Amino acid sequence: MEAKEQDVSLGANKFPERQPLGIAAQSQDEPKDYQEPPPAPLFEPSELTSWSFYRAGIAEFIATFLFLYITVLTVMGVVRESSKCKTVGIQGIAWAFGGMIFALVYCTAGISGGHINPAVTFGLFLARKLSLTRAIFYMVMQVLGAICGAGVVKGFEGKQRFGDLNGGANFVAPGYTKGDGLGAEIVGTFILVYTVFSATDAKRSARDSHVPILAPLPIGFAVFLVHLATIPITGTGINPARSLGAAIVFNKKIGWNDHWIFWVGPFIGAALAALYHQVVIRAIPFKSK
C-alpha cells in the first residue's frame, strides 16, 4: 500500500496545477527565453558618428518615397475615372496602402525598424524604444521622402491633372465635422501603433523569430483595415508624413484647411497606444527592478 501511495503522490507531482486561462505557463522564477531591450537614452550623441544611424535614415527616406509613389498613384487612378466600377475602388486603395506597408516594413525592419510614419516613430519614442535624436532624424527623412514621392507622381500626372484630382491630399469629406475627422485619425492611428507594439514585442519576437513575416503582416493588415473604414471620412491619414507630403505638392487651400487634424490625431492616437501597451498590457511601470 505504501508503494502505491508513493506512486500516486509522484504521479500527481508530475503535472503542475492547472493555471487559469490567460496565465502564462512560464513562472516568474524561471529564466526568460527573451531579453527586454534597455530603454533608449533621451539623447545619444554617439549616434551622429555612426554610419548605421544615417543608413537607417536613408532607408526611412526611400521607404516613405516608395510608399507615397505607389499609394498616391493608386488614388489618382481611382479619382480619375467617373465610374468607380472601372477602377480598383476603395478596396484597391486600401490594399495599396496596406500592401506597401507590409512590403516596406519587411524590407526595412532590420535596418531602421521600418517605421515609415512619424506617428509610429513618436509612439516608439514615448515607449523609449529609440532616442530623441533618432526620432527627429527619422521624422525629417520620412517627410522628405513623402514630398519626393508625391512630387514624382505630380511629374507623371502633370500639374493640371494632379490639381484637378486633389493630389491625393487628405481632408475631411463633406458631411463630416472636423471632430469626426479628428476622432477617425485618433482611433485609426491607435489601431496601427498598437499593432506595431504587439507585433514587435520582445517576447513575441523571440517566439516567432523563425517566421520573420509575422511582424510586417499584421501591421500591413491593420493599415488595410483602417483605410477601408476611414477613407470615406478623411481619405485616411494615420501618417503625418503621407499627409504633409501630398499637401505640400498639391498646395491648394483644401489641402491645408484641415491639415492640423492629420498631425494632432495621429500623435494622440500613437501616444494612447504607447500608454496602453506599456502600462496596461506589459505593466512595465509595475514590474520589479
UniProtKB/Swiss-Prot annotation:
* Chain ranges for the short sequence motif NPA 2 as given in the UniProt record: 239-241
User: Which Pfam families does this entry report, sorted A to Z?
Assistant: MIP (PF00230)
Query: What's the chief localization of this chain?
Result: membrane
Annotated signal peptide: none
MF-aspect GO terms: channel activity
Subcellular location(s) of the protein = Cell membrane
Q: Which UniProt keywords apply?
A: Cell membrane, Membrane, Repeat, Stress response, Transmembrane, Transmembrane helix, Transport
Which segment of this protein is annotated as the motif NPA 1? 117-119
Q: Where are the transmembrane segments?
A: 58-78, 92-112, 136-156, 179-199, 213-233, 261-281
Q: What induces it?
A: By water stress, heat shock and to a small extent by abscisic acid (ABA). Induced within 30 minutes after the loss of leaf turgor.
Please give the residue ranges the record annotates as the region Disordered.
1-39
Mind telling me which NCBIfam families this protein's record contains?
Answer: MIP
What role is this protein assigned? Aquaporins facilitate the transport of water and small neutral solutes across cell membranes.
Q: What is this protein called?
A: Probable aquaporin PIP-type 7a
Q: What is the lineage of its organism?
A: Eukaryota, Viridiplantae, Streptophyta, Embryophyta, Tracheophyta
Encoded by which gene? TRG-31
